[in-house]
């Protein structure tokens, strides 16, 4: 029996938007099983200078509930490659806005661990008003700053 083709993608997935769904659907079309690596809160703080709005465990639960996703795992606090090495995917999907990984450098680092996955970058952004979590945050602040929220 042939082994299932496994794809991996990674990200923060804070304040979900159509771009996230586009990347996840794209990834699932390339594999039988899609595993999503969720960036840890501390990692996001180091990279972006702020913690995510949604805590890592809640982001993991939300991503796992999405149709194209078979499983979600939290990233490593010490080594960003650790979950990829443990999963040993056939394909790695890089989102259009991801700049953490340079593809050639990622290939070289994975080859040092004996891994040779195909790496595909999603080139197309979703053309919509809120295609990034940051844009959503800016709009929330714009609408609600200095206003009392009514619940």
Curated annotation (Swiss-Prot):
Alphabetical UniProt keywords: ATP-binding, FAD, Flavoprotein, FMN, Nucleotide-binding, Nucleotidyltransferase, Transferase
User: Required cofactors, per record?
Assistant: a divalent metal cation
Q: Name one GO molecular function term.
A: FMN adenylyltransferase activity
Per UniProt, what is one Pfam family of this protein?
Answer: CTP_transf_like
Q: Organism's domain of life?
A: Archaea
Report which reactions are catalysed by this protein.
FMN + ATP + H(+) = FAD + diphosphate
Binding site residues for ATP: 12-13, 17-20, 97, 125
Work out whether the entry's keyword set contains Flavoprotein.
yes
One of the GO biological process terms = FAD biosynthetic process
User: Pathway membership of this protein?
Assistant: Cofactor biosynthesis; FAD biosynthesis; FAD from FMN: step 1/1
Q: What is its EC number?
A: 2.7.7.2
Q: Which InterPro entries match?
A: Archaeal_FAD_synthase, Cyt_trans-like, FAD_synth_RibL, Rossmann-like_a/b/a_fold
Q: Which NCBIfam families match?
A: cyt_tran_rel
Q: Give the quaternary structure.
A: Homodimer.
Enumerate the PANTHER family for this protein.
Answer: FAD SYNTHASE (PTHR43793:SF1)
Similarity comment: Belongs to the archaeal FAD synthase family.
Function summary = Catalyzes the transfer of the AMP portion of ATP to flavin mononucleotide (FMN) to produce flavin adenine dinucleotide (FAD) coenzyme.
Q: What is this protein's name?
A: FAD synthase
Q: Which organism is it from?
A: Methanococcus vannielii (strain ATCC 35089 / DSM 1224 / JCM 13029 / OCM 148 / SB)
């Amino acid at each position: 029996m042939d082994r299932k083709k496994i794809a991996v993608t990674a990200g923060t997935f804070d304040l979900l938007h159509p771009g996230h769904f586009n990347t996840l659907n794209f990834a699932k079309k390339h594999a039988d099983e899609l595993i999503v690596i969720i960036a840890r809160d501390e990692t996001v703080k180091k990279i972006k200078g702020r913690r995510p709005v949604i805590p890592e465990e809640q982001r993991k639960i939300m991503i796992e509930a999405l149709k194209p996703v078979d499983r979600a795992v939290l990233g490593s606090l010490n080594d960003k490659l650790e979950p990829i090495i443990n999963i040993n995917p056939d394909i790695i999907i890089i989102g259009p806005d991801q700049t953490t990984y340079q593809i050639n450098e990622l290939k070289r680092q994975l080859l040092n661990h004996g891994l040779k996955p195909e790496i595909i970058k999603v080139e197309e952004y979703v053309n919509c008003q809120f295609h990034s979590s940051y844009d959503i945050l800016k709009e929330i602040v714009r609408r609600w700053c200095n206003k009392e929220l009514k619940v």
